[in-house]
Amino acid sequence: MCRDMLPQDIFDYDPKNLWDYYYKDGIYYIDHHQSHATYAFLNSNFEQSDILAIDGIGSKYRCVFFDKDQNLIDLSDELPIGWLWNHMSNLTGFGTLGASKLMGKVGYGKYSEYYYNIFETILNGPITEKKQKHFQHIKLDNIDNLAHTLQKFTIDKIKEYVYPLKTCDNLC
């Protein structure tokens, strides 16, 4: 396995800044979310920006925020939105890594208070990588509405947790 071939201290790498990196014995490494954030920033053409990277998995994080000075703030516990999208895409038949397919349904649905409350309840519970057995009790009578509501939920959570951290007008 690839993990066995890498130096063990690479797994202890803990970036504090957007441009931090691990380098040893010819191995260059940056964190998965750091990579997403860097790509977003470099392609934004902003000279300065806050950056948000949300994803379902990564070696260390689920969600990170970089302020305008490029300092990393770990929001993995507060905002595991990518994790929720992954689990909902699996539940709706799009597969564990099919969140983009579920996102494609957003424009076809309507807001559902039922789904919104479900998402609130889920994020108030344990966030684990294992399949959540209680998810099977979620009614899937309208996947379009689930997707639409999950997008609204995502935006609301970003406003709740990320907007207070903003240090400039730009956000990647």
Describe every region a protein language model picked out.
Residues M1-Q8, T167-C172:
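Short glycine-rich phosphate-binding loop at a beta-alpha junction
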Residues D25-Y28, D141-F153:
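Short, surface-exposed alpha-helical recognition segments that flank or form part
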Residues E47-D144:
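A short helix-loop
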Residues D25, E47-S49, T167-N170:
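Short coil/turn segments at beta-strand junctions that form active-site/ligand-binding loops
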Residues H32, L79-W83, T149, F153-K157:
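Conserved active-site and cofactor/substrate-binding residues in soluble primary-metabolism enzymes
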Residues Y28-L52:
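Conserved phosphate-binding catalytic cores of ATP/NTP-utilizing and phosphoryl-transfer enzymes
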Residues D12-D31:
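Conserved catalytic cysteine-centered active-site region
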Residues H148-L171:
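Phosphate/ATP-binding catalytic cores across multiple sugar-kinase/actin-like superfamilies
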